[in-house]
């Protein structure tokens, strides 16, 4: 906890930027929710807050469990923390999904702190939202099994495109600068696992794109098969009241 507070005090401007970006994403989610959930019956506030908190806690713990990938540098690791967030967004709407995403990152910070001066944490939040937001907005409009498939496919596609561009434009160069490394040193980590990676575009194409695509597909499949079961567990009594 002390380490986290020290990191906040050392990076006040960037933390404020993170909060501003979070507020902007919440507003975007609120607009999408108003558009597709105008006359939908809503759960009471206490149950919503409790459910979002529980799913965020599960996500925060899942975020700690990371799996290395054979085709990507060691700083790209797979986790399934988006699964509870997607279930939250499908059940309660885009705003709840974004709040759950934010709390997930916050819980992870409390558990492990930050080793990236919050840059990686902001990236995780934004890339996660690029998956959850479009998927949940479309699902809330369609509300069917076919709609769920289309929504998850859309979310995976948006996350893959956004995550890849965000890595190329901001994240990889920022990490290189933060650790005082030339960009070539980051690329060399990719070359070690795949000789075809020789520059930033091939690093993104051969490591970042497959990473986001694999994560999106796996989380989507799990969400499709688990969503209704988890929804019944968390939401049945509240919806009957």
Which residue stretches match the model-derived regions?
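Loop-helix junctions at membrane interfaces
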Residues: 1-241
